[in-house]
Amino acid sequence: MANFEALYDDSQMPLRGTKNSAGYDLYAHEDAIVPAKGRILVKTGVKCWLEPNRYLAVVPRSGLALKQGITVLNTPGTVDSDFYPNEVGVILCNTTDTDFEVKKGDRIAQGIIHEYITTDVDNVADKERTSGYGSTGVK
């Protein structure tokens, strides 16, 4: 089971474009500028509750990538089940030489819910998640 929850009264809930779409469109909850050759974190205004052994993969929208040169850095962005109750953000990267304007309500990425399995001998660091975006360190 998985659910998206609005964090604000004006949050746009993720939506699948068609009944056979795998991805839920994720919407910007703020205006932003993705600088030329730069990257920013854009908030979505939603959080995602996931059962253990599920995660949300945040991936680029093909139209933004092809037509505008805007992609998602660290693709797929992995939102683990223990990331809840934090707001889902999207790391947008501009591959062009021109700043790109994001308006609140723009579709900026897709979220695909996946199930995963672990190994029989599951080695887990003795840590509790305190936030996201690199909170478990690099070493």
Regions found by a protein language model. Give the residues of each.
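DUTPase catalytic domain/fold
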Residues: M1-K139
